[in-house]
């Protein structure tokens, strides 16, 4: 974790209690895990415990529980609203073992969700990304493969028919995303 002081970065991971010295980090994602309007940190570790850090006062606290924090051969962690219910799910892209999907319930309880698409029980996933590729308001999941040799990209589309969406994209005066903007409807 680095603090940006006018373009000069200072390592503050230890100060904020997110230093994970004994794990082999593979991916990081940001998400509002407790739906408080604050970003929390998801940290994934190769064959080590995965972490879910939430800001508690002036330090972060790991709220991860099993089965979320169980070690896996992880390559990527993504937080996104895959089912269009307004709340993020957490996708873990693993190599040589099934991918996993979690929902964070009230109080920070992690519940594994059965995956219809994207499980890839023996896939050699090396990374993943999420976007609304076809513009229908439902996020697609793109998984890359190829640990050794050629393997294709796989694009997964969720079969969702019972949720609606409204896309609002606040921009600043330069056309960039207006981070921290508040939208009132």
What spans do the regions from the language model cover?
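Blade-edge motifs of beta-propeller repeat domains
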Residues: 2-23, 53-72, 102-123, 160-169, ...
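Structural signature of WD-repeat beta-propellers
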Residues: 4, 45-47, 55, 94-96, ...
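Beta-rich catalytic cores
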Residues: 24-26, 48, 73-75, 97, ...
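Beta-propeller blade termini
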Residues: 25-35, 39, 74-84, 126-135
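Acidic/hydrophobic-patterned starts of short beta strands in beta-sheet-rich repeat architectures
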Residues: 35-44, 84-93, 135-144
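Structural motif
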Residues: 49-53, 98-100, 149-156
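Gly/Ser/Thr/Pro-enriched helix-cap/hinge segments flanking short amphipathic alpha-helices
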Residues: 109, 114-185
């Amino acid at each position: 974790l680095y603090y940006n002081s006018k373009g000069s970065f200072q390592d503050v991971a230890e100060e904020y209690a997110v230093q994970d010295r004994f794990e082999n980090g593979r991916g990081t994602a940001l998400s509002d895990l407790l739906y408080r309007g604050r970003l929390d940190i998801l940290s994934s570790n190769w064959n080590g415990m995965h972490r879910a850090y939430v800001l508690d006062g002036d330090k972060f606290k790991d709220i991860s529980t099993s089965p979320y924090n169980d070690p896996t051969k992880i390559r990527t962690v993504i937080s996104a609203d895959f089912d269009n219910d307004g709340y993020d799910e957490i996708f873990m892209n693993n190599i040589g073992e099934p991918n996993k999907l979690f929902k964070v319930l009230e109080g920070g309880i992690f519940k594994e969700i059965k995956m219809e698409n994207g499980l890839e029980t023996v896939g050699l996933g090396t990374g993943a990304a999420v976007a609304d590729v076809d513009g229908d308001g439902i996020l697609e999941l793109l998984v890359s493969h190829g640990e050794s040799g050629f393997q294709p990209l796989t694009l997964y589309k969720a079969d969702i028919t019972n949720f609606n969406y409204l896309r609002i994209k606040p921009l600043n005066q330069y056309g960039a995303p207006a981070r921290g903007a508040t939208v009132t409807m």
